[in-house]
C-alpha cells in the first residue's frame, strides 16, 4: 500500500559530497575528536553511573553525542501512499463506522518511523477523511491547527468559528487552532474525500493538547457563505472592517482555479526555483506570512518534462499530487507518483522532483512545519553539490521496507540556499 526507503547506507553515502574531511585533514564528523564526548567506560565509572541512576540522574557525556548529533537524524522515512490503493479502503469505512461514533471518519497515514506519534513525517499528521452524502459532523475545537485539501467530491463544507465555507476538488482550507469547526457533505449523490493535515504530534510533544466538544454540538453559521473569501480573496485588503489581529490568516479557503491560474501566470513571468519549479506559498493576506503559526502550505508547478535540482532543508513536508504524474528522488530513493498520491520528505533529506509528462504540467500541493523552523531560527537549506545537482538513485523504484533512513552528513552549519 505504501513505499518506503530502506535503511541502507548505500542510499545516502554515495549521494552526497559530505566534505567530512576538512582542509586540515580532520574528519569533521568524528566522535573521537576533541570537542566531542569520548569518555571510555571503566569499572569505577560504571559504578558511578549506577549511583547517579539511583537518584534519577545521569552523566551527560554518556549520551551527549546522541542527543546533539552533527546533523539532523530524523526517525521518519521517505514514504509514498498511493491514492488508488487507499481509496477503496477509505470508502470501506463508510458502512463500517458511523461518523458520530468515530468523531471523524479518517484513515490516517502513518510513517513507519513515527508510529508511536501517529505522524506522517516529523511532527506532522495527515489522513484521508470521508463523508457520505448528506452527512454532518458535530463541532469541536482543539489546540492543534488543521488544514484540508479536497481530493474528490463536490458537496464538501466546513464551518469555522461560525463561518460556512464550501470547498471543491483541490481547494485548500484551514482550521486554525482554537477555532470551533464542523464538517459535512451536502451532496446527495457521492461521498467527499479530503486530506487532513494537523500539527497534533507537535502539540502533543509540547504537552499542550486541549480538546472541547461544542456545547450545542453544532454551530449556527452566519448568513454569508465563504465570507472570508469574499472579503480577503481579491488581493486587496478590505477597509471598514474590524482590524484583524489574530495570529492566523483571516482568509480561510483558497479555491483551486485561481490558485492554479496564479501558478500559470507566474510561470510566464519568472523561471522559478531550480529546486521547486514555479512555487508559491498560500499566505496570510494581512501579514504576507504563513497561513498559520505552526504550518505553512505551498503550491508548485513543474513545467512539462522539467526536472528540478536536489536540495535539502530543516523542516518536514507532506506532498499531495494535485495534477499530473512524475517522480521524486528522496534520500537516493525514487518514488513515482500520479494525481492523488501523497508522499513525504523528512527534515534534512535530499529531494528533487521531475514531471514525466512531456506535454502537460504537474502540480504539487504541500504543507510543512517551516513556520516553526523559522520562528525558532532553526531553518537551514543547502543545494546538492554534486552530479549537476542530481542524486544517484540507489534503486529504480522504492521498495516497501519499513526501516528508518540514516540521513547523510554534510556541512554541519549550512548557509541557506535559495529560500523556498
Each model region followed by its residue ranges:
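A short, N-terminal "cap"/entry segment at the start of jelly-roll beta-barrel domains
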Residues: 2-3, 27-122, 219-294, 298, ...
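Asparagine/serine/threonine-enriched low-complexity, disordered tracts
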Residues: 2-27
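Intrinsic, low-complexity N-terminal interaction/targeting segments
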Residues: 115-118, 125, 137, 145-147, ...
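A short beta-strand-loop-beta hairpin characteristic of the jelly-roll/cupin
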Residues: 132-169, 176-179, 184, 312, ...
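A short hydrophobic beta-strand segment most commonly corresponding to one strand
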Residues: 147-149, 174, 188-208, 319, ...
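Short amphipathic alpha-helical linker/capping segments at the junctions of internal repeats
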Residues: 172, 214-219, 334-343, 352, ...
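Contiguous mid-protein beta-loop-alpha structural module that forms a pocket-lining wall or clamp
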Residues: 177-231
Amino acid at each position: 500500500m505504501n513505499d518506503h526507503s530502506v535503511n541502507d547506507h548505500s542510499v545516502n553515502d554515495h549521494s552526497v559530497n559530505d566534505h567530512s574531511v576538512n582542509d586540515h585533514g580532520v574528519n569533521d564528523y568524528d566522535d573521537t575528536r576533541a570537542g566531542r564526548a569520548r569518555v571510555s567506560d571503566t569499572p569505577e565509572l560504571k559504578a558511578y553511573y549506577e549511583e547517579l541512576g539511583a537518584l534519577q540522574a545521569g552523566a551527560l557525556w554518556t549520551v551527549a553525542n546522541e542527543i546533539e548529533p552533527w546533523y539532523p537524524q530524523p526517525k521518519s522515512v521517505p514514504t509514498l501512499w498511493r491514492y488508488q490503493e487507499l481509496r477503496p479502503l477509505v470508502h470501506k469505512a463508510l458502512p463500517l463506522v458511523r461518523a458520530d461514533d468515530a468523531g471523524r471518519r479518517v484513515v490516517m497515514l502513518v510513517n513507519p518511523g513515527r508510529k508511536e506519534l501517529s505522524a506522517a513525517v516529523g511532527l506532522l499528521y495527515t489522513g484521508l477523511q470521508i463523508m457520505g452524502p448528506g452527512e454532518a459532523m458535530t463541532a469541536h475545537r482543539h489546540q492543534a491547527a488543521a488544514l484540508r485539501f479536497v481530493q474528490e467530491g463536490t458537496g464538501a463544507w466546513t464551518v469555522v468559528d461560525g463561518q460556512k465555507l464550501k470547498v471543491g476538488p483541490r481547494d485548500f482550507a484551514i482550521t486554525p487552532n482554537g477555532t470551533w469547526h464542523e464538517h459535512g457533505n451536502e451532496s446527495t449523490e457521492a461521498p467527499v474525500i479530503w486530506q487532513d493535515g494537523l500539527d497534533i504530534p507537535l502539540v502533543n510533544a509540547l504537552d499542550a493538547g486541549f480538546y472541547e466538544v461544542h456545547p450545542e454540538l453544532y454551530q449556527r453559521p452566519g448568513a454569508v457563505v465563504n465570507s472570508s473569501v469574499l472579503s480577503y480573496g481579491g488581493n486587496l485588503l478590505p477597509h471598514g472592517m474590524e482590524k484583524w489581529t489574530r495570529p492566523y490568516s483571516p482568509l480561510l479557503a483558497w479555491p483551486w482555479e485561481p490558485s492554479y491560474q496564479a501558478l500559470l501566470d507566474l510561470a510566464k513571468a519568472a523561471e522559478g526555483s531550480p529546486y521547486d519549479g514555479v512555487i508559491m506559498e498560500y499566505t496570510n493576506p494581512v501579514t504576507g506570512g504563513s497561513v498559520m503559526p505552526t504550518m505553512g502550505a505551498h503550491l508548485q508547478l513543474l513545467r512539462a518534462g522539467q526536472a528540478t535540482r536536489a536540495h535539502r532543508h530543516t523542516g518536514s513536508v507532506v506532498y499531495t499530487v494535485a495534477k499530473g504524474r512524475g517522480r521524486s528522488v528522496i534520500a537516493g530513493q525514487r518514488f513515482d507518483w500520479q494525481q492523488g498520491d501523497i508522499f513525504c520528505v523528512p527534515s534534512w533529506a535530499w529531494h528533487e522532483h521531475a514531471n514525466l509528462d512531456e506535454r502537460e504540467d504537474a502540480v504539487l500541493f504541500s504543507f510543512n512545519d517551516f513556520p516553526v523552523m523559522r520562528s525558532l531560527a532553526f531553518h537551514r537549506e543547502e543545494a546538492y553539490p554534486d552530479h549537476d545537482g542530481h542524486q544517484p538513485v540507489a534503486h529504480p523504484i522504492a521498495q516497501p521496507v519499513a526501516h528508518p533512513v540514516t540521513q547523510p552528513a554534510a556541512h554541519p552549519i549550512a548557509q541557506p540556499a535559495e529560500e523556498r
